[in-house]
Structures are given as structure tokens and as C-alpha cells.
Amino acid sequence: MEKKILFPQIGGIMHGGDYNPEQWLDRPDILEEDIRMMKKAGMNCATLGVFSWSTYEPREGEFHFAWLHDIMDKLYANGSYTILATPSGARPAWLDETYPECRRVDSYGVREHHGVRHNHCMSAPVYRKKVSVIVNKLADEFGNHPGLLMWHISNEFGGECYCPHCVKRFQDYLAEKFDHDIEKLNKAWWTTFWSHTYNDFSQIEPPYRNGEFSIMGLNLEWKRFTTWNMTDYMKAEIAILKERTPQIPVTTNFMKEYDGLDYHKMQQPLDVVSWDSYPRFHNDEESFSDTMTENAFDHAMIRCLKKEQPFMLMESAPGLVNWHPFNKMKRPGVHRLASLQAVALGSDTVQYFQWRKGRGSFEQYHGAVVDHLGTDDTRVFREVADLGEELKKLKDLAGTVVKAPVAVLYDWDSLWATDGMKGLAESTRNYIKTCRKAYRNLSALGVDVDVISSEEDYSGYSVIVAPMLYLLHTHVGERMKQFVEQGGHLIATYVTGYVDENQLNYLGGFPGDGLKDLFGVISEEIDTLYPSDRNCVHFAEMPEGEVRDYAEVLRVADGTNVLGTYEQDYYKGMAAVTERTCQNGSAMYIAARLDDASMQHLYARTLKKAVSYTHLTLP
């Protein structure tokens, strides 16, 4: 079993969470009790300083770190390490008052007021300067502390800014990308439509809601720029810490399959990837099993950002959250189940937000290990403590690297392009849900599944599943062809390969970029079904399948096997599912959105050829 130990100091699985002692500095009795109860809960790490800027620096240039020295010393003396965050996720009032350009401008061009969090401009030079000051101070004060285990960069990056600084950086970003050739950009974005041709990069604005949002290429590049700009900002923080403390690893906490940032790009400067997991347990829209499988998809997606090592579950709620539409309490045993699921899928940590509930403000009712009751005599605390003991017994799992023979392709570019397209049906495109469904149906067959980018290396996988890969980068088609020629098995679905990286349609038939030859099909039409519409697919070797939402009408090339045909409408009798073999590999095309049972049968058909698993649960 391959291993890579992230934190040898821990000697096992990390167990901890966000701790906010700055909220309790006037209650030394509570701070002392925290140390006692952390030991009782089996915690060996605490995340500090996430939102501590106004405590560190209550007035510009006036710094207070003695309280944090005291806390870190006591934690370390009691066997607990510290993950120390840079506090740039939320700004003190003096900063916004003195430097208003730090505040974001929204998509209508309006400057936001001071308040809440995660609403700072990543481009503002003065903001970057003030962040560099506090980050340097933290490195000076705590870089050599024996209890410092890791740096946590800011918190849950997200959002967009449309201020003049960001507009100028966007224009410069585009000029660099398109070789300072405005005609190259015009061609890539098809700007002659509606007479939107640009004469100079200085004319380009972001997609304001009260401005230009009709150019698909512009909208897509704005999303990419936002990822680039935030990553550039994050790298500036990391550079300071790496110069001062090169031995200390860095991370930041990602959020589910957050649609605002491309984590495949953003993970690159990090040493370890981590994320915050908050499933909607016990909701009335899906089964408990589906909730767990969706969470497993998220774990796999995060894990595969750095497949060669474990990831970190940076935040989870031991009880409930306070921001879901309905904040239902985890039932007994569910916290243990969800935590062990994370470990089984490759996490070397189980961590919480938060250790102790605050008395006021936005997250006063967010779940915590220690409730407002303030004791260790609660169900939640007992479950956390029991889990702490169990994690100690699982210490040998630390460092385990998960290897999967099957991968589902998930691309932020395809997500953004699919969400932003004007076509099909907005309510049923559902790119993320379609990828999750593929993961769920493969997992139901008992196979381990990765979730990777289409631009990653496919070697090591036997089966690649590409659900609705609407945007196909021009080099990916050739890589898919090589994968199949080398014995791999590729499965793609409807709405694959319609546009290139600029969101221009491929010409000559879909799927584009050579995939029509690989699959031996051309999608001539796509029928968008109303929610009440149904069709069926007849299979010779499996039960009839139900079709909802989308059905492509295919032209099938010679040498392509038809596995299923439509039973209704004007395309009755025409191909709905096909397969084409190539040496020892195969390429299956599923032209309609089929029910789960049918998808599992089709996946099983390929898995039987591709994966040597004695424990597969195949229909």
C-alpha cells in the first residue's frame, strides 16, 4: 500500500478544528476549560487565527500577539499542534475606512460597504500591501514555534470584483493571452455578432449585469480570470511564508465543487489540498445514501487535485450548520459515519468548524463540539470524543494513497460553458448533477472512482467516463483517442464536444475535435424534452431504459455497434447507445439521459471487460 505521510508529528489521523480563543479573551476560565476538553475529545490540532485580524491589529500598525503565543504554548504543552491561518478572509473596519478601494465593486458597478467577509478586492495594491504586513508579522512571531504545523491561507476564497483595478488587470490578462492582438480575440469570441467588435483591449469590460454579457467567450474568460487573479493573490501570501518558513506546508480550504473558481488551477501552489464538507443530511429531497454518495464525489474530486497524497477534511459540522434552508441535526452515529467516510476516501484529517459556539453574530447557532451549555456532557461531545478514540486506533491509515481504476471527468470550463450557454433547457442542463450521477452509478457497482480534469493524465485508468463534456479543449480529443488505442475504455454522453475552449462550436459535426471518428457517430440533432416528456430505449441484452430531458439523434458510421435504439417519436428505431472498438479499447456513446438502472447496466458492460475486481456488484 502506497503511503505519503503529511504530518509525522501527529503520528496518525489529525483530529481538530477551528478554534476562536480571541472571542473569549475576557474569560480565562473558559480558555482553560477548552484545553481540558480538547484533550478529552482526543484532539491533536487546532486551527487558529482565521478571523483574527482586528485582534492582531486593532488599529493600523498596532500589533498584539501575546494572546496567541499563550494559546499556542498551552496547546503544544498539552499535545496539540496549530494550523495558523492568515487573517485575510475578513478585514478590520479601520482598513476599509482608511482604504476604501479594498472593498469590492459588485456586478452592477457599485462599491460595497464594510461588512461580512470574503468581499475584498484581490487586485487592490493597498490591500495586498496591508495583507503582506500582517502575514510577515505572523511569520516573524510564530514561524519557529514548535507547535506550528501548517499555514492556512485566508479562508474559502470566492466571489468576484468589478472595480477599476480588476478591470485593468482583466484587460492586461486578455492582452497577454491573445498575444496583444485584438483581432485574434474578436475572432475567438465571434464579436461580429450584434456588432460587438472591439478595437482595443481597453474597450473590454467584465460581464456587468447591466452591461455586456452576451458574448460567451467574454463570460468564460472572466471566470478564468477570476481564478487566475485569486490564485495570483494567494501565491503572494504563500511566497512570504515560503521565504520565511520553507519547512512549513501551506493549504487553503476549498468549498465543495464551488462554481466560482477552477480548483484544478488553484491547487497548484498549495502543498496540501483541503476542503470544508457540509452535506445536507436527512433532507427531504434525496435518500440518505444519495447524500453520502454526493459527499463521496466531493471527497474524490478534492483528493484528485493532488492524487499522489492524502487530502484534508478541514471543516465539518459535528452537529448542524446554520445556513442550510433547514438546519437539521445529525442523527446519532451520522457524524462517525461521515468522518470515517472521509478517512476511507483518502483524508488524513477530521476537523470541525467550530470548537466552541460563539455567543453572538452570524454563526452563533452554527454547530460546534462545545455548545452554549459549555460542558462535555452532551451527545455531540461524546460522539466527537468517541470518534477521537477510534481515530487513534486507525493511526496506521495515515498517509494512505487511494488508487482507483475508473475516473469521471469533471471540468470547471465545461461547467461554466454549460451554465452560460443559451440553449437546451436551463432547468435541466445540470452539469454537476450529471457528473455526480455518473459517480453514484459507478460506485453502486463496487468500483473505486476518481474525479479528474479532462486535461489530466489518463494513464493508470482502465475506464474514463465523460458526462456532458460540452467544452472540449482542442488537445483533449487526441488524448482520448490515444487512451482508447492503448486499451482504455471511454464512455461519453450527449452534449459532449460541442464547443472549443473559446466556446465556439466545432464544425463538421458533434462530438468535435475528432471524437466523431473515435465514437463512430455524429449527433445531427438534440431533442430537449419537457419535464413531463418521456422516451424509451430498447436494448437487446438488458431491460428497456427510460429517457428524460435530452435525446440526441445520431448518424452512425459503418463499424459502430448499436446497443440501444429509441422506441418513440420521429427518431424511433434510431441509435441511442453505440459502441466502437479499437484494438483492445472501446468508445461508448450514450446519446440520451437514461435512468440509473440503465446507466449501471451500461457501465457494468464496460467494467466486465476492463476491471479485474472480484467484489464488483454487477447487474
At which residue positions do the language-model features occur?
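N-terminal carbohydrate-binding accessory modules
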Residues: 1-45, 397
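Short, well-ordered coil/turn segments that N-cap beta-strands
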Residues: 11-13, 42-44, 78-82, 144-149, ...
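The substrate-binding groove and active-site-proximal loops of carbohydrate-active enzymes
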Residues: 15-25, 52-66, 113-130, 157-160, ...
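Short, acidic/polar
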Residues: 24-38, 256-263, 331-339
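Aromatic-lined substrate-binding rim segments of carbohydrate-active enzymes
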Residues: 32-39, 47-106, 237-244
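Polysaccharide-binding and catalytic clefts of secreted carbohydrate-active enzymes
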Residues: 109-297
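Carbohydrate-binding surfaces of carbohydrate-active enzymes
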Residues: 201-204, 235, 247, 278-281, ...
